[in-house]
C-alpha cells in the first residue's frame, strides 16, 4: 500500500516538474520587474507638475514595435532615473521619493542587464539616435510604464522581427500618460493612404491575438498530456499491484484460519489427556 502511494506522489511531482518550465515562457525579462513599479503613481503625485526631467527619447516609440526601441529606451531611462535620484536626499521613510526612485533604478538596471543577455536574439536598434528632451513627471513616467509593460510581451512581439524604420509620413508622436494598460503599438504607417494604414493595423491586431492563442495552446497542451500520462501510469501501476494485494489478503486470512484450527486441535488434545 505504501509503495502505491509513493508511486502516485512521484507521478504528481513529475507532472509539476514538466508543467513548471512552461508557465514562464511569456516575456524574456518579465521576471526582473517587481511590484515596486506600482509606486510610480505615488511618486508622480509627490513631484511638482511643472518639474522637468531630462530624457534621451528614442524616436518611433508610438509607431514601431517594442523590440525596435526597448533596448535603447531602457538604457536612457536608467541614466535619467539615476540623475533624478542624485537630486533627492536619502530619507529613511519607506514611501519617500528617494526610496521609490532607488527601487525603480534597480529594476531598470536589471532590465538593462537582461537586454544585454538577449541583445542578439530579440531586439533591434532604431534607425535614429535618441534625442534629449524635457518631460514633466507625468509624461516621463508614462514612458517608463510603457517600457516596463513592453517587457511582458517582448517575446511575442519579437517573434516576427519587423524592420525598425520610421516612415516619412508618420504622424507626430503623442504624449505618453501614466497608465497601467498594455503598450499601444502601431505598425509602421504606410505611405499610400489612411485606408491602407487602417487595414494594416487591423491585420496587426488579429495577428497578435492569434499569436497569444497559439502560445496559450503551446502551454496548455503539453501540460494536459503530461497530466493524462501521469494518471495513466498511476492507474496502470495500481492495477498491476491490485492482484498482489488481493492474494496477500487471501493468504493472510488462510494463515489466520490455519492458526485457529491448530489452536482448537491443541486444546482438544489437552482436554483428552485430562
From Swiss-Prot:
Keywords of this entry: Cell adhesion, Cell membrane, Cell projection, Cytoplasm, Cytoskeleton, Disulfide bond, Glycoprotein, Growth factor, Membrane, Pyrrolidone carboxylic acid, Secreted, Signal, Transmembrane, Transmembrane helix
Molecular functions (GO terms): cytokine activity; growth factor activity; stem cell factor receptor binding
Listed transmembrane segments: 216-238
Residues annotated with Pyrrolidone carboxylic acid modification: 26
Residues with attached carbohydrate: 90, 145, 196
Paired cysteines (S-S): 29-114, 68-164
Signal peptide coordinates: 1-25
Cytoplasmic face of the membrane: 239-274
One cellular component (GO) term of this entry: cytoplasm
Gene Ontology biological process terms from the UniProt entry: cell adhesion; positive regulation of biosynthetic process; positive regulation of cell population proliferation
Post-translational modification: A soluble form is produced by proteolytic processing of isoform 1 in the extracellular domain.
SUPFAM superfamilies according to UniProt: 4-helical cytokines
Function: Stimulates the proliferation of mast cells. Able to augment the proliferation of both myeloid and lymphoid hematopoietic progenitors in bone marrow culture. Also mediates cell-cell adhesion. Acts synergistically with other cytokines, probably interleukins.
Assembly description: Homodimer, non-covalently linked.
Protein's UniProt name: Kit ligand
Gene source species: Bos taurus
Species classification: Eukaryota, Metazoa, Chordata, Craniata, Vertebrata
